[in-house]
Amino acid sequence: DSIDMYINNRHNPKSIRYKTPQLKNILDVTYGCMVYQEQVMQIFRELAGYSFGRADVVRRAMSKKKHKVMEQEREYFVNGLKNSDGTYACDGCVRRGIPAEVANSIFDDMSSFASYAFNKSHSAAYAVIAYRTAYLKCHFPAQFTAALLTSVIDDSTKIALYIDDLARLKINVLSPSVNESF
């Protein structure tokens, strides 16, 4: 879903829709899609008035799928959290003019996304690894898959999957041989 939306929005910037205008400044660099953990934290901070620390605690709870914590935080995200002295630890979206239905929808998006998000500072390293992996698989498919097969030697399901991939590429796989194998 998110990948398709990202690609569509990248090619058709006019199709980008934000559930609330406050999301534009946060998500415009990623074509209206949540990609980075930092974006989730920024949404908590800017839409609901969370502190940096509390936003990070919620981000970690989401990534670890701590449902009880997340449901409590949903209430705070939407309606705010009042301290014992009557002040607000966080305002909540409703107090900041965002309808509860919209706030709940944004929270749902963040919850489903959070377990797949990654740290923005790591994205360049991931991109380099992905690029190099794709290059090796494209230009050296037999050698790439040989290394891949070695890495999953104990998993017959993955071995079968990779051998099928080689067959699709019309690359022959030889059986092990005591006379010829290294």
Model-based region annotation:
Residues 1-182:
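Noncatalytic, beta-rich nucleic-acid-contacting surfaces in large DNA/RNA-processing enzymes
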